[in-house]
Amino acid sequence: MVVPKNHLYDPDVQLIKSRLSKLPASMLAKLNAKHIKIKLIDGPITSLPEFAYLKGQVPRGWEKTNKTWDDVPGIGGSETVAIRIGYSDYGKGHGSVNLELHETAHSLDSIVYMRISQTESFKKIWKSECLNLFGENQYFTNYPEEYFAEAFAMYYLNDTTKSELKKKAPLTYTFFQNLQ
């Protein structure tokens, strides 16, 4: 994990580290083996050289928000996961239950598990449970990779979100229970 020197002891940074440390050791080892870096930043994600090309661009699913990647507090899916410090919680510039878990899940999905969200077996689960879990939220009902990332975040965030996942999407819950 890469943390700005002026934020090493920031309580928000400590909470991010704590939440990510709840992931199974085998999963953390796979992130490390694939050289996936989690960068905590104190400015826009587009300030990082690897994401500068996104400046002024509108993210998929954000077309009606008047927001660009400059406003989005996190990104995952590549060898770099970028998380803006202080934006972890729902409603802080995003609609996820937890930013760092959601964005890390994208890199796990695309790199570690070789796009597991696009497999027929996962898509079958997604199609059968996405409406029950997320209602008509098109971000999760249209994109299996977003469903994967958000359900992953629910599984690992806390007992309340994990219980909600188990109740509303038992197949998804079992999928993550078995994912190492």
Please name every model-derived segment.
Residues 1-19, 29-180:
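Active-site-flanking segments in enzyme catalytic domains
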